[in-house]
């Protein structure tokens, strides 16, 4: 059907409908030079495939040093495990000036953005579908999966 350009008559599922209270923030890193630690942090979530499901891994990384400041595993993608990771990183290293994430529901949620605002952090978000805006943590996921997850099974 796809090759012929045909569409089914049933409605397609809408799995990613943003909630009205989830605000999208502008991307602040377009023309900024990173010159010191704690200037810009980023966060992202990836999934780790298992024999019977997935685990979700969130990591927070400093853009200057490329160091993972905090990480957590969870069997659900709720916002609380992300907020706990943020609390750990801020508790150990102090708040950054700018925090960059994608537009995932965990990072646009009230709990996440409120925690950053309370710490006086400027919020930056990648453009929709622009994975290169958060390239350092995406590279971390690639290295982690190919070196530690996929490779042992080859």
Could you tell me what each predicted segment is?
Residues 1-154:
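Charged DNA-binding/catalytic regions of mobile-element recombinases
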């Amino acid at each position: 059907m796809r090759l012929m350009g045909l569409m089914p008559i049933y409605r397609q599922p809408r799995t990613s409908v943003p909630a009205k209270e989830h605000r999208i923030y502008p991307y602040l890193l377009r023309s900024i030079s990173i010159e010191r630690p704690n200037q810009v942090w980023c966060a992202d979530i990836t999934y780790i495939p298992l024999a019977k499901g997935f685990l979700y891994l969130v990591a927070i990384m400093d853009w200057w040093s490329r160091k993972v400041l905090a990480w957590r595993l969870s069997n659900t993608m709720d916002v609380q495990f992300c907020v706990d990771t943020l609390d750990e990183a801020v508790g150990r290293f102090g708040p950054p000036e700018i925090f960059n994430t994608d537009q995932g529901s965990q990072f646009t949620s009230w709990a996440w953005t409120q925690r950053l605002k309370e710490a006086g952090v400027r919020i930056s978000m990648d453009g929709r579908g622009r994975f290169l805006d958060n390239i350092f943590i995406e590279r971390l996921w690639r290295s982690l999966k190919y070196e530690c997850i996929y490779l042992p099974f080859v």
